[in-house]
Design a protein with these regions (language model features):
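A short, charged helix-loop
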Residues: 154-161
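Conserved small/polar residues in nucleotide/adenosyl-binding loops
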Residues: 163-165
Length: 165
């Protein structure tokens, strides 16, 4: 199980550098990390907040609960054909690092989304976009952890309803 810290300052975890604290804080990378933290009776029933890069989060007060900070992970090609690469990317990967990796690997299509702050998980949730490109155009499905069922769940791009208004 990842280490769970108590009374952690969130100042370095948000781009506004707001100095508030989380009652409990854990760095997580995998679904197993999340599952193990939430399976612990000390943390499983607490309010929870999943934090990525902190670039679209404005804290206004201390968080009373367990803060799960998505951090790191893997980038893996799961399939490919004549036109596409199918890539599984962990939510905690820094978005710009993934874009750079994609360009260096010859996986084109998301290069217009370079230099957008945050993580891959946040990119999918927010449908980041720039210069006529939206990340939704490149998502087939998202695998996510359902904390209530404590199980993985796969959502199709249609299930996500990723649109910009």
């Amino acid at each position: 199980m990842p280490t769970v810290e108590k009374s952690v300052s969130l100042k370095s975890y948000n781009t506004f550098a707001v100095d508030v604290s989380a009652q409990y804080f854990a760095e997580v990378c995998t679904p197993e990390d999340i599952r193990s933290v939430l399976a612990d009776p000390r943390y499983g029933q607490l309010p929870r907040f999943v934090l990525g890069g902190g670039s679209n989060t404005l804290f206004t007060k201390d968080f009373e609960g367990i803060m799960l900070h998505m951090n790191g992970g893997t980038i893996e090609v799961t399939d490919e054909n004549d036109r596409f690469y199918f890539v599984k990317v962990s939510a905690g990967i820094v978005w710009d690092d993934f874009v750079r990796h994609a360009i260096e690997s010859g996986w084109y299509g998301i290069e217009n989304l370079a230099a957008i702050p945050g993580t891959v998980g946040g990119a999918a949730v927010q449908n980041i976009g720039a210069y006529g490109v939206e990340v939704a155009e490149h998502i087939v499905e998202v695998e996510c952890f359902d904390p209530d069922r404590r199980a993985m769940r796969v959502l199709s791009a249609e299930d996500l309803s990723l649109i910009h208004i």
